[in-house]
From Swiss-Prot:
It comes from Chlorokybus atmophyticus (Soil alga). Keywords: Chloroplast, Membrane, Photosynthesis, Photosystem II, Plastid, Reaction center, Thylakoid, Transmembrane, Transmembrane helix. Its main location: plastid. This is Photosystem II reaction center protein J. The chain crosses the membrane at residues 10-30. NCBIfam families: PRK02565.1. GO terms for biological process: photosynthesis. InterPro entries: PSII_PsbJ, PSII_PsbJ_sf. It is found in: Plastid, Chloroplast thylakoid membrane. It is a single-pass membrane protein. Coiled coil: none annotated. The keyword Zinc does not apply. GO terms for cellular component: chloroplast thylakoid membrane; photosystem II reaction center. The gene is psbJ. Belongs to the PsbJ family.
Amino acid sequence: MSNTGTTGRIPLWLVATVAGLAVIALLGVFFYGSYSGLGSSL
């Protein structure tokens, strides 16, 4: 269970960071769309 043998595998912290940023971006877009009255374009 060492970090040196993770060749070919994506680090968990990188996955968590990208997923967290994607969720925050999606929530921001949805909230901004519903606030501006443009959220009904779905």
